[in-house]
Amino acid sequence: AIISLMLLVSCKKNTESVDVCIYGGTSAGVIAAYTASMEGKTVLLVEPGRHLGGMTSGGLGYTDIGNKFVVTGLARDFYRRIGNHYGKFEQWIFEPSVAENIFKDYVERGNVEVLYSHRLNEVKKDGARISEIVVENSENPSPKTNKQIRAKVFIDCSYEGDLMAHAGVSYTVGREDNSVYGETYNGVQMMRGHQFWDPIDPYVVPGDSTSGLIWGVSHDVLQPIGTGDKKIQAYNFRVCLTDDPNNMIPITRPDN
């Protein structure tokens, strides 16, 4: 009887039921969690890492924006809260740490439970519907510490789409051809703007095409403009830079 009671307590400890479970603490994940909570739903936000905000708090502090007036709702609210931090009405360029604190404030104000450092391990379905997911500790995975999460609605807000893929739903990867939806800027595009200000010679020996291409320049022939493919955007490191002499630290060359 004692053993059965211990197993029951352990099972309850590692099982949680909510209205909405959101996988991925990206900016979209945080806002989705906050919105659901403000609508009166019980919410669990699962983040595989230790930080909230995704790219917004991970180094992408320069917002790609054309017409700011198309930004509304909680996105606009976010940028105005950023602005408030800097003593302005709104702010589109910011420090990642400031963005993360704003996202933390959203989950705190929304009373959203956040499960950090847990990644997807298994998806259980009832027919075509997800009934439960199992997550494991990202830093020290062990079946003993796995957690079962049951929810009426699951939302995948991760960048990789792991929950989506494990659930077996249809999806596509890459960029579609212009012809698929009768659009203009899909697929292969020759960059007419956003180029380096200073020309970079592509050859190992500048000006000598026989010397080969420098690292990162592809030998592939460019396909016609608008052609679709299965390629995804490159993964990059993003860092904060400054032109303020009082805020500078040297960028040192690695030993290798």
Across the structure, where does each feature detected by a protein language model lie?
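Sec-dependent signal peptide recognition
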Residues: 1-3
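Bacterial Sec-dependent signal peptides at the C-terminal "C-region" and cleavage site
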Residues: 5-17
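Flavin (FAD/FMN)-binding glycine-rich loop and adjacent Rossmann-like elements that form
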Residues: 11, 141-153, 157-256
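Beta1/beta-strand and adjacent pyrophosphate-binding region of the FAD-binding site
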Residues: 14-28
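Glycine-rich, N-terminal phosphate-binding loop of Rossmann-like dinucleotide-binding domains
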Residues: 25, 137, 158
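Mobile, glycine-rich extracellular loop/lid and propeptide segments
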Residues: 27, 34, 119-121, 133-135, ...
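Conserved N-terminal/central alpha/beta ligand/cofactor-binding core
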Residues: 35, 41-42, 47-126, 172, ...
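Conserved beta-strand-loop-beta-strand element in the redox core of flavoprotein oxidoreductases
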Residues: 124-148
